[in-house]
From Swiss-Prot:
Subcellular location(s) per record: Nucleus
Protein name: Myb-like protein B
Organism name: Dictyostelium discoideum (Social amoeba)
Domain of life of the source: Eukaryota
Gene Ontology MF terms: DNA binding; DNA-binding transcription factor activity, RNA polymerase II-specific; RNA polymerase II cis-regulatory region sequence-specific DNA binding
Residue intervals of the Myb-like domain: 540-598
Primary subcellular site in the record, as a coarse category: nucleus
Signal peptide: none
Cellular component GO terms, alphabetical: nucleus
Amino acid sequence: MTAIFPNSNIPFYYWASTNAQPQQPQQSIQQQQQQQQQQQQQQQQQQQQQQHHHHQNIPPTPQPIFSPQLINKNFGCYGTSNQIPMIPQALFPQQTFNYSGLPLCPSPPNYNNYHTITNSPPHQIHSPQLTIDQHSPPTCVSGELSPTPLSSSTGFSNNNNNNNNNNNNNNNSNSNNNINNNNNNNIKRSYSAMMEENNYPNNNNNNNNNNNNNNNNNNNNNNNNNNNNNNIINNNINSSGSISSYSNNSCIEDDYSSDKHCSDKESSNDCDDDADSYFEEYEDDQEAIRVSITPFVNLICKTPGITIPIIKIFSECSKEEITVKQMLLKVSLFLKIIIKIKIKIKIKILIFYFLFFKKIKNLCLEFNLDNSIHNTLIHSLVKIDGDIKMVKYLIDNGISEQELEFTKDILLTSNSQEIIKKKRERKRESISRGIRSPPNKWTKEESQNLIKLVTENGDKQWKKIATKLGGGKTGAQCAQHWKRVLSPEIKKGSWDEAEEELLFQLVDKHGQSWKNVAIEIKTRTDIQCRYQYFKAIMSRQTEWNQLEDDILTKKIKLMTQNNEKISFQQVSKHLARAKTTKIPRTALECKSRWSQLNSTNVNNNNNNNNNSITTSSSNTNQQQQSTMVTPTSSPLSSPIPMSTPIINNSMPQQQVQQIQQQQISIQPYPQSFIQETQGFYRGNDQMQYHIQNQTIPQYHHQHNNNPLLML
């Protein structure tokens, strides 16, 4: 049940420090008298209702447990008309604490001879509407903390009003209980039983304090009220519906030293470890936390109006509504986490508090506090941790170096461990049903058994074969081992030139769909096809060197000399043994290279033959010219070429001219032969040879230059 304040967003309690000055709100006498009259009227109405029901023998209507009519002034808690404390279970917190020896929120006592404590139904709960003065600072007495005075229309009176109520106030309930005769004894017994159950050691001291306060009660009501504040039960309405109590400095000390007080879900989620481990391991550091948090509390209490913006900042950072108590708990928990930074850290909480630092700095500028709240938090972080890496961490998160100049005067260590997230170690697990397993090698016996099972059952029932085979082998493993290793249809080793030519044709047809390529080849697997294709492409991209050409030609000449069939598969293996290149040559590439080398040799031979023909033709022309120029003594004295006609000197001149004209028109090579030779050499892609016209003598009809005419 959350307390709702109509006039402000201030939570149920302000927390004051030891240095704050006591200030009490002033009320007029008329207001005090009005409140007294209202209380008397309420009591009279209650008595009339009880008498009316008693005469009519009608059971009284059940009043809401939280209604103001059931407030017993003598006890200060909800009770019945028999002066027996009737405390509903919803009012008790989840845990009890030991503050100054008095249980502030005691657990329900074991009333064996009294009425049974019952829970009130949800529809009967009516929470009193509480109001609080926004401008009144918290009340402090003798350096001890106390909650702010509350004004209420339901029976909770203010401090000044309590001083004038003849010791019938709710705040003096414990002292007045000790004055009554029978009722006091019952309550003493009940409280002593509760204290023994809850192990409260300072029970007797508290009773003595109560008696001393009761003796001085009639003399000075104001002092009595202030002294009884040490034992008052302060009701703080939590979000869960239970009421928790805090009064003294020990309250804050216990609040900030134990995570058990994190009754709210928001604060308990921020606790990483149990409260016991914190208290046992870091008992010495709790005092440092309390000391470091007091200046922060002092500044909040001394600055009027700053509580609401601070709570708003906390609610914005944590994205939830928060009270002052929860705010201080979060600050203390953060300091604990900083202490435990060497062991464990929660990054989410650090981000929250660094956002808070930035916003609180702007708030200090608005209230002209010179960043005092901001600086005190930074000082507390650095001093408690005492490490250089904490200073670096603060700088990385937006805190300036000027704000950390005080660290130069502090001796800092460098022992804290860096915040490192451990990488998850990935483990390889079984591949059965989608999970990877360790490698399961095949033995010779398993391979032989697989061959037998395949011959018996065929190459399709792999699950059946795997179950019969055993050894942890799956159906997929059996199928792959059969198709890639044991099948007699699959070839192993290097490819010949015919297979490689077929491979390139099928790749042009199907692309890189290796299953379809392997289906058409039938003698190679898809993996073999893929490997051979890329190997051939990489081999073609590298140029041949002279050493490789020599090895290739020597190997082929040896094969021809031994009358062996030329196998380029063996030639490629021979080249691979030489290790002239990183990538071995394929059989098809060796074949294409040999054809290239052979064609160049043929072209060179043709070139040599052509040169011999041209030289012979030039020699014949020279012989013809020599026969024409030199005269012969007799026709049989010198050999006469067949192309030269026999000329008689006794022939008439006209016949000689006709013979000379016929002789000039004769050519050594016909035109058709020249065209055929030119076409032959032009058709060759490697070397082209053109017949020069200069090698063919062409004779023109010139009478002046004719040697026969000169005779």
